[in-house]
Amino acid sequence: MSGRLARNAVANVLQTLAGAGLLFALYRYINKTLGVEQLGVWSVVLATVSASRLADMGLSTGVIRFVARDRARGELDRASRVIDTANLTLMASVGAVLPLLHPLLAKLLPHLFDAVHLVQAQEILPYALVSLWLTIIATVYQGGLDGCQRMELRAGLVVAGQALLLAFAFWLVPRYGLVGLAWAQIAQGLFLSVTGRLLLRRALPHLPWLPRRWCWGVLREMLGYGASIQLTTLFMLLFDPVAKALLARFGGPAAAGYFEMANQVVLKARAVIVTGNQAVVPHVAVLAESEPARLARLYRQNVRVLVFITLPAFALLFAWAGAFSWLLAGTYQREFVFLLGLLVLAWGGNIFDAPAYFTNMGTGHVGWNTLSHVIMGALNASLGWLLGSWYGAHGVAFAYAIALVTGSLVLIAVFQRRHGLGWRGGLAREHLGLVVACAVVVAFGWIEPLRPSTSRPAVLAAGLLLPPLVLGLAAWFHPMRRQLLGWLMAREART
């Protein structure tokens, strides 16, 4: 692993850790100030307006690959044209679509909320659309920083934006409620857009101060790449947003609120691991041009590291579900704990498709990623409605988990077959002890869930200390620990 790749991976992980802390502080504050039902309204409205991302045309995601490729070829002027072309196109296309979507989304909301919560949802809808427009623009600059392999700049930018959101929420929410939170998001989007371009000019000096270098040839190439990504976006809209909408319909805004919190806990833990892996996208784009034979070895290495890190991390999440409920909701909530446990299992299976997913992005084989999202989206929408009609919010959650795992398994199987890796693809007997330890911890968390506010001190101490002790011992005797330590020591010696 090169020094730059390691630096980018560390920057991604630190950004995710800091961002998770800021997000959880925001959730705790909203829960305390407004309540879980208003958190659910906010979550569902944001998921609903994400339909506007169809106007993105896959450009914001494609920026990473094209900037990385053009820099690898020494075409820095063209890399700056990629940024401006994507930026100007999205400012116009998304800006034109948003006013048209507003009346359509306003007609959808009555099917999701009752009278009281409907008024709140309709009130924040326009603000959510403006916030999304700013966020999409900011995503172009963040993708440019990733393509320049300056992820430490992007990480600092995103964390600063999240801190700004929290500060504005503390200021505006007590005065204006959910509308104050919406204004805080607009302030965050404006900050990310302006500061993002300024930082990108440091990494790409050919970029002018203001976007003005639009190029049809660049756009045509990006649209060709973005077609598969855009299809992916379409089916992603049948995943998370549809799940939240179905939860609001069949379980009410409180169910959507608990799902939002539980899902974010798992996603932030997943992101700590996966964002380190995301650093390989520009690296893979370079390898695809220079040393394509190294891609399979890089994939195997990624999978082995993921198994070593993911299994104990997600087992610990499962065992500590009650502690997260107390942290975010202020008390032990059975609904939250159930959803967190289910999502830990689902996202824990999904995380192993990350090496295949990001390698495909780097090499341009994004069609297989699209297939995975098609499967997830179609299963989630169809099963979610069916199981939600029968079993309410729990049925929707189970459909979400089934869709997530199924789509991930298909992507892994196809990637390993294409590269002749077989079903193991990096898995080995060395992980057996770790798997057993994780199974013990999960069983312990299921039998004796952690209840910080009601458990006896001895039981609470056992619930907090035994899981990390068991997992830590298994990780200590795992051969991957020595290999990771060797990589770190070798890198330290080089620097």
Regions found by a protein language model. Give the residues of each.
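N-terminal membrane topogenesis motif
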Residues: M1-L23, D77-T85, L118-Q122, R213-T232, ...
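Interhelical loop/hinge segments that connect adjacent transmembrane helices in multipass membrane
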Residues: M1-L5, G196-D240, A279, H283-R297, ...
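Hydrophobic transmembrane helix module of multi-pass membrane transport proteins
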Residues: L14, L88-P241
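Short runs within selected transmembrane alpha-helices of multi-pass transporters and secretion channels
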Residues: Q15, G19-L23, V45-V49, R53, ...
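Interfacial/gating helices of multi-pass transporter permease domains
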Residues: I30-S50, Q122, V179-W183, G217-I229, ...
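Helix-loop junctions and terminal segments of transmembrane helices
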Residues: M57-R73, N87, L101, D146-G147, ...
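Interfacial segments at transmembrane-helix termini and the short loops linking adjacent helices
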Residues: L105-A128, L317-A354
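Membrane-proximal transmembrane or re-entrant/amphipathic helices at the cytosolic face
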Residues: F444-T495
